[in-house]
Amino acid sequence: MRAFVDESSCLRTASTQEYLIGAAIVSTEDCDAVREELRPLRLPGQIKPHWTDESASRRRSITRAISELGSMHVVVAHLSGRNRKTERYRRKCLETLYYELAAADVLDITLERRSDSQDKKDRAHIVALQNQGWNPHLRITHCRGGDDPLLWIPDAVLGAVNASYTGEHEYLDLLRDTILIEKRTPESLEPDSRQNERP
């Protein structure tokens, strides 16, 4: 089994924000076939489908296609006060994700590429965790989103999660049965019952 990982960060209230990490889990032998099923989702001229750039009808098409792929998904969230610096929240989410994936024997993890310096921090982070006794077989690589269609899956899953907070539940409803694990980091704030929390 392999995991393909993307991130998202959104405001939740006037004073809080949420950092999310999403992973699509795909069996190794199915990866190429799933990539071929996803490729038609890329429009002419697009580098990749990207949730924030898509229309409502396109979002429906994308989530419907993903719901039929057979991939399973993990979503990890960290709710905090508003802060422009999110690398610490990313590390906390990745720690929870790595723990859950290792427990499921998913050790081959592809993260969407960011900048060289940010990717270097990801690699240093996993080395530090392994030096503390974490599973030594966990392996991360980075890849540009346009180069691997499997990275389009977590982008859409996190997009659907974020849309649900603004009352657009139809996308997440299509994907609900594919979300295997949904966790908050140990240091995450709990959602305020007064905010528009999704069901």
Where are the regions that the model predicts?
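Phosphate-ester processing/binding pockets and catalytic centers
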Residues: 1-199
